[in-house]
């Protein structure tokens, strides 16, 4: 289907461009969201008659978005979730979760359609998510998914929590392996000369008691 764009659409074009798109994309997204018009003769004339106003309105919305971008770009939100020791979440973080977290942090006016998340987040860590405030104004928000505020703080400092935990477990296991677990292991680790000396001392003590 041939359409006239009413705003900039990534990979398609800018205001006033006439482009061809798949019928489903036009009918299900572009046309109902007032992002384009069918490129028939009547709509071409209508667009040209209103081009100045359309461009002025777009410039106003872009300016407003640029003002908001200063307060949002680079912001980091923290989402506390339960996860396994391998870092896999028991569930996932969705676009709705991100929008709600931004709202709780005082960022209003961000809708689900503005958040560009290819797939739900299913593991701990930091993820950069793009938020399209306007077709020409895109900001980045850091999503910090952790099991606790302390872990979130560590991740914000660039520490890989899962790797750090794994290293700690390895160190504990190595330390435990060096400690004798029984008297037999202790004796096995004790030089024969020391064991003989201990035995002599015990014999001497027994003789005194006798």
Curated annotation (Swiss-Prot):
GO terms in the biological process aspect are:
translation
Molecular function GO terms recorded: rRNA binding; structural constituent of ribosome
GO cellular component terms? ribonucleoprotein complex; ribosome
Q: Where is this region: Disordered?
A: 172-210
Q: Where would you find the membrane-spanning parts of this chain?
A: none
Give any Pfam family that matches.
Answer: Ribosomal_L9_C
Keywords, comma-separated and alphabetical: Ribonucleoprotein, Ribosomal protein, RNA-binding, rRNA-binding
Entry's family note: Belongs to the bacterial ribosomal protein bL9 family.
What is the protein named? Answer: Large ribosomal subunit protein bL9
Which organism encodes this protein? Answer: Sphingopyxis alaskensis (strain DSM 13593 / LMG 18877 / RB2256) (Sphingomonas alaskensis)
């Amino acid at each position: 289907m041939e359409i006239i764009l009413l705003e900039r659409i990534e990979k398609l074009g800018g205001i006033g461009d006439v482009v061809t798109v798949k019928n489903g994309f036009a009918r299900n997204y572009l046309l109902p969201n007032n992002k384009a018009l069918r490129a028939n003769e009547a709509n071409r004339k209508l667009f040209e008659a209103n081009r100045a106003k359309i461009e002025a309105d777009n410039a106003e919305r872009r300016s407003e978005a640029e003002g908001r971008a200063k307060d949002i770009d680079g912001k980091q939100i923290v989402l506390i979730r339960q996860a396994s020791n391998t870092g896999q979440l028991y569930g996932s973080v969705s676009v709705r979760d991100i929008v709600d977290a931004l709202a709780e942090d005082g960022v209003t006016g961000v809708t689900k359609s503005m958040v560009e998340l290819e797939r739900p987040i299913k593991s701990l860590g930091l993820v950069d998510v793009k938020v399209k405030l306007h077709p020409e104004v895109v900001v980045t928000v850091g999503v910090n998914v952790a099991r606790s505020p302390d872990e979130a703080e560590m991740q914000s400092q660039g520490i890989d929590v899962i790797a750090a935990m794994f290293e700690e477990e390895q160190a504990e296991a190595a330390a435990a392996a060096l400690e004798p677990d029984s008297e037999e292991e202790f004796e096995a680790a004790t030089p024969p000369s020391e064991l003989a000396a201990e035995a002599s001392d015990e014999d001497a003590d027994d003789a005194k008691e006798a």
